[in-house]
C-alpha cells in the first residue's frame, strides 16, 4: 500500500543532506542517511509542481517510524551506547512465555542481557496474613478456627489492619472497584480498599465493633449470561473437578475408544500400505515387495467406534476481527478490554494438553472467561452465513491447546468439552515457535508431521461433542520450504491415508495462517501474498468439495464442518483499519486475527469498526490503563496478592504499549508495526511518559492506580536489560 504524506515538506539542511538522528530501540542508521544531488534553485513565485512537492517531502525509510521532525529528540554529538533491540524476544515470548526452556546459567556468572527464562516476580503478600475464619466475620463474632492456638495467621482484626497490612490505597477515590461493581468485596478485611466497605458499630455493651458493609441493591445485579457465576465468570472449573482430573477419577471413554481404534488403524495402514509389521515384541520392519490393492486396504478398514457429534455452525466475516491467542498478554482483563473496544472473538492463552490432563490448576485457570466473552458476536445483517448458523447460540471465547501426541490433545479436548462447555471452538496451536515447545514436538513442530497432525485433529473432532475444532498454523518451519499450501489441502480434503480409506476430511471448521515461518520469528514482515495464495486455494477447495468426494461412499454430514465450508483467517502485522481492509479485500481471507497490534494499541478494533484512524490522546490511553487496573483487581483480587499480580501483568502490557507512536506524530500513514522510531517526545508530558522505554516510568504508571509497589516486588520483563528490583 502506498504511504501517504501527512505534513508539509520538511526543510532540508543547506548542504542538501537529510538530518541525522540517533535512533533508539535497535533501529539502524545504516540505510537512513542518504546524499541528495543538489537541486536547481526555483524562481520566485514559480508554481510548485507535484513532482517537486513529492521530491521535497521526507522519504519514508523502511524499518524506521516516520516521526515528524518537530517531535524528534536530538541527541548529543557524543557517541551513545546502543540499546539491544529486544522486541523480537518479547514478541516470541508473547506466544508461549510460560513454556520456554529454563536454561541454567553458568555458575559464578550472571548474564545481564538476553531473555529472562526463569522469571521471578518476588513476593507481594501481607507481613502476616489474617486467618480465614476472621476475614469476613464481624470483629466480635468470628467463625471458629480449626487450628486454634496453633494457627500461624493473625486472629485479631485490628492488630492485622494496624501492624500487618499495608495502608489502604487512595486510588479510584479510595473506593473498592469490586464493591462498587458488585455490592460486596470477596476479600473482606484483606482488601486494600477495605476502608470503603468497613465501618464501626456500637454494640449493646458500648464497645465499637468492626463490620463489613454490603450494598444490597448492587448485589441484585444479574449476570449477562445465565451460566456465569456471581462474579461474571464462565468456565470456572471447581477444585473438586481439578483434583478428580489429576487423580484420573473423571473418565474419558470416548477418547479411550477412539485412541484404541486409531492405534489399530494406524498399524493396519502401516502394514498394508508400507509393508511395516508390528507385534508386541518387535519394532516394525519393512517387508519386501508389498503391493496391496485399494480394495484390500478398504476391506481391512474397521469403522471408528462412533462418528463425531454434529457441531455448532460457525461464522467468520469482515465485521468479526479476532484477538489472537497470546500467552501472558492474553489474560482475562486484557481480553475483556479488547472486547469492550470491538474484538468479536477471543481465545484463551495457550494451554498444554498434558497439563490439562494432569489437572494443573494454573492451566485450567486459563479457561476462565468473562461474561462479556460469552455473549454472541455482532455480525452484519447482510453477512453470507452458512446454513444452520444460529447467532444466539454463538459466543466469542474459544480455547487454544498445544500437544505433541494424539492422546494428549484428544483426552484434553474431551475434558474441555465436559468441564468447560461454554467454548466457541477448541483451537490446536501449530504455530508456536518457542524452542522448548518445538523440541517437545508440539506447536510449529507439527507442521513437519502432517499425517500425525491430521490424526490429532480428526480425533479432537470426534470427541469434542458440539464444539467445533480449528487450527492455527504458520507458513512452515523453514524459510526455504513453506508447506502451508500442502497442509491446508490436507486439512480441507484429508490426506492420502484418509483418501485410501474414504473417511473424508479431518473435520476442521477454520484454519488460521500466520504469515511467517518458525525460522523467521518476528524478524521479517508477514507474507500476505502467500496468505492470499492459501486463501484462493481454500476457496477453490470449498467449491469443489462435492467433486472430490467419492460418490460411492458419501461422508456423513457430521464429518463436514459448517456444511463443508472451511473458514480461513489471516494473521500477521495488522496494525490499523487500513491493514485490515487491505487483507480482507486483497488477500481474500474471511477475517483477520490481530495479535501484537492489539497489545500495542487495543483500540485497533475500534478503528476497524469505525473504518478510520483514531489519534487517541494521552488521557484516553491512560484511561485504558485505568480500566485494565480495575479489570485486573476484579480478576486477581483487591488484596495484597491481587494488587501485586495486577501490577505484574500491567507492566507486561506496558512493555508493549510503550512502542506505540501516536499517529499525530507521523509524517506517513498507515503506521507499520515493524517500524522502530527515533528518540521522540510527545505532545505533552503524559504522552512522552506513555512512550518511555524506561522500566522506571512503567512502574510510575502502575503506581497511579495501584499505589507504591510492595517492598518485595520484582519485575523481570522479557529482556534482562529492563529488570526491576526494589531499592534499599
UniProtKB/Swiss-Prot annotation:
Residues 1-133 are annotated as: Disordered. FMN binds at residues 325-327, 400, 472, 514, 571-573, 595-596. It holds the Pfam family Dus. Its cofactor is FMN. SMART domains: ZnF_C3H1. The keyword Protein biosynthesis does not apply. A zinc finger (C3H1-type) spans 125-158, 175-200. One of its GO terms (cellular component) is cytoplasm. It catalyses: 5,6-dihydrouridine(47) in tRNA + NAD(+) = uridine(47) in tRNA + NADH + H(+); 5,6-dihydrouridine(47) in tRNA + NADP(+) = uridine(47) in tRNA + NADPH + H(+); a 5,6-dihydrouridine in mRNA + NAD(+) = a uridine in mRNA + NADH + H(+); a 5,6-dihydrouridine in mRNA + NADP(+) = a uridine in mRNA + NADPH + H(+). Its EC number is 1.3.1.89, 1.3.1.-. Keywords: Cytoplasm, Flavoprotein, FMN, Metal-binding, mRNA processing, NAD, NADP, Nucleus, Oxidoreductase, Repeat, tRNA processing, Zinc, Zinc-finger. One of its GO terms (biological process) is mRNA processing. Residues 14-24, 33-58, 117-127 have a biased composition (Basic and acidic residues). It is an enzyme of class 1 (oxidoreductase). Its main location: cytoplasm. It is found in: Cytoplasm; Nucleus. SUPFAM superfamilies: FMN-linked oxidoreductases (SSF51395). Belongs to the Dus family. Dus3 subfamily. This is tRNA-dihydrouridine(47) synthase [NAD(P)(+)]. It comes from Aspergillus clavatus (strain ATCC 1007 / CBS 513.65 / DSM 816 / NCTC 3887 / NRRL 1 / QM 1276 / 107). The lineage of its organism: Eukaryota, Fungi, Dikarya, Ascomycota, Pezizomycotina. The gene is dus3.
Amino acid at each position: 500500500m502506498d504511504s501517504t504524506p501527512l505534513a508539509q515538506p520538511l526543510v532540508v539542511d543547506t548542504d542538501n543532506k537529510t538530518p541525522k538522528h540517533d535512533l533508539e530501540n535497535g533501529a539502524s542508521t545504516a540505510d537512513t542517511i542518504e546524499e541528495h544531488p543538489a537541486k536547481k534553485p526555483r524562481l520566485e513565485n514559480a508554481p510548485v509542481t507535484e513532482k517537486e512537492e513529492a521530491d521535497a517531502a521526507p522519504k519514508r525509510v523502511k524499518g524506521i517510524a516516520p516521526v515528524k521532525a518537530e517531535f524528534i529528540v536530538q541527541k548529543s554529538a557524543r557517541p551513545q551506547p546502543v540499546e539491544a533491540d529486544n522486541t523480537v524476544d518479547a514478541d516470541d515470548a508473547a506466544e508461549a512465555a510460560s513454556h520456554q526452556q529454563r536454561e541454567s546459567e553458568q555458575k559464578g556468572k550472571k548474564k545481564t542481557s538476553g531473555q529472562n527464562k526463569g522469571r521471578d516476580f518476588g513476593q507481594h503478600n501481607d507481613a502476616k496474613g489474617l486467618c480465614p475464619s476472621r476475614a469476613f466475620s464481624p470483629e466480635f463474632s468470628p467463625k471458629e478456627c480449626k487450628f486454634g492456638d496453633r494457627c500461624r495467621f493473625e486472629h485479631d482484626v485490628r492488630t492485622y489492619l494496624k501492624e500487618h497490612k499495608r495502608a489502604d490505597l487512595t486510588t479510584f477515590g479510595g473506593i473498592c472497584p469490586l464493591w462498587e461493581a458488585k455490592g460486596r468485596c470477596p476479600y473482606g478485611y484483606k482488601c486494600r480498599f477495605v476502608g470503603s466497605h468497613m465501618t464501626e458499630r456500637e454494640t449493646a455493651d458500648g464497645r465499637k465493633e468492626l463490620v463489613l458493609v454490603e450494598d444490597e441493591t448492587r448485589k441484585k445485579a444479574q449476570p449477562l449470561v445465565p451460566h456465569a457465576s456471581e462474579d461474571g465468570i464462565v468456565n470456572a472449573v471447581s477444585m473438586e473437578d481439578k483434583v478428580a482430573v489429576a487423580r484420573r477419577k473423571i473418565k474419558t471413554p470416548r477418547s479411550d475408544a477412539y485412541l484404541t481404534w486409531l492405534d489399530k488403524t494406524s498399524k493396519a495402514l502401516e502394514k498394508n500400505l508400507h509393508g511395516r509389521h508390528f507385534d508386541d515384541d518387535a519394532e516394525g520392519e519393512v517387508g519386501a515387495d508389498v503391493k496391496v490393492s485399494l480394495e484390500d486396504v478398504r476391506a481391512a478398514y474397521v469403522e471408528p467406534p462412533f462418528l463425531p457429534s454434529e457441531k455448532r455452525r460457525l461464522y467468520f466475516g469482515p465485521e468479526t476481527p479476532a484477538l489472537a491467542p497470546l500467552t501472558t498478554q492474553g489474560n482475562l482483563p486484557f481480553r475483556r478490554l479488547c472486547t469492550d473496544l470491538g474484538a468479536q472473538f477471543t481465545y484463551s492463552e495457550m494451554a498444554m494438553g498434558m497439563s490439562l490432563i494432569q489437572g494443573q490448576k494454573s492451566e485450567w485457570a486459563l479457561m476462565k472467561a468473562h461474561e462479556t466473552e460469552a455473549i454472541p458476536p455482532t455480525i452484519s445483517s447482510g453477512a453470507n452465513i452458512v446454513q444452520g448458523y444460529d447467532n444466539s447460540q454463538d459466543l466469542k471465547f474459544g480455547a487454544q491447546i498445544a500437544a505433541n501426541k494424539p492422546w494428549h490433545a484428544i483426552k484434553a479436548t474431551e475434558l474441555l468439552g465436559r468441564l468447560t462447555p461454554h467454548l466457541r471452538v477448541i483451537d490446536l496451536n501449530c504455530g508456536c515457535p518457542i524452542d522448548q515447545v518445538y523440541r517437545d514436538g508440539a506447536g510449529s513442530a507439527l507442521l513437519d508431521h502432517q499425517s500425525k497432525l491430521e490424526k490429532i485433529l480428526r480425533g479432537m473432532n470426534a470427541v469434542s461433542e458440539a464444539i467445533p475444532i480449528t487450527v492455527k498454523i504458520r507458513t512452515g518451519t523453514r524459510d526455504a520450504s513453506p508447506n502451508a499450501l500442502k497442509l491446508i489441502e490436507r486439512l480441507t480434503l484429508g490426506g492420502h491415508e484418509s483418501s485410501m480409506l474414504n473417511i473424508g476430511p479431518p473435520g476442521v471448521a477454520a484454519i488460521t495462517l500466520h504469515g511467517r515461518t518458525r525460522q523467521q520469528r518476528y524478524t521479517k514482515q508477514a507474507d500476505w501474498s502467500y496468505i492470499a495464495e492459501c486463501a484462493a486455494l481454500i476457496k477453490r477447495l470449498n467449491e469443489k468439495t462435492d467433486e472430490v468426494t467419492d460418490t460411492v461412499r458419501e461422508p456423513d454430514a457430521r464429518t463436514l464442518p459448517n456444511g463443508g465450508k472451511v473458514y480461513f483467517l489471516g494473521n500477521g502485522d495488522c496494525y490499523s483499519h487500513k491493514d485490515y481492509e487491505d487483507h480482507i479485500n486483497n488477500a481474500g481471507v474471511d477475517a483477520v486475527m490481530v495479535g501484537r497490534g492489539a497489545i500495542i494499541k487495543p483500540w485497533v478494533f475500534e478503528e476497524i469498526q469505525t473504518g478510520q484512524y483514531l489519534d487517541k490522546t494521552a488521557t484516553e490511553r491512560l484511561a485504558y490503563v485505568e480500566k485494565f487496573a480495575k479489570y485486573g483487581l476484579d480478576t486477581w483480587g483487591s488484596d495484597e496478592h491481587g494488587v501485586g499480580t495486577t501490577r505484574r501483568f500491567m507492566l507486561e502490557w506496558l512493555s508493549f504499549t510503550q512502542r506505540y507512536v501516536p499517529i499525530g506524530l507521523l509524517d506517513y500513514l498507515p503506521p507499520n508495526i515493524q517500524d522502530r522510531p527515533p528518540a521522540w517526545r510527545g505532545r505533552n508530558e503524559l504522552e512522552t511518559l506513555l512512550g518511555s522505554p524506561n522500566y522506571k516510568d512503567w512502574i510510575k504508571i502502575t503506581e497511579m492506580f495501584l499505589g507504591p509497589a510492595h517492598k518485595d516486588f520484582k519485575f523481570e520483563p522479557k529482556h534482562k536489560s529492563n529488570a526491576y528490583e526494589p531499592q534499599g
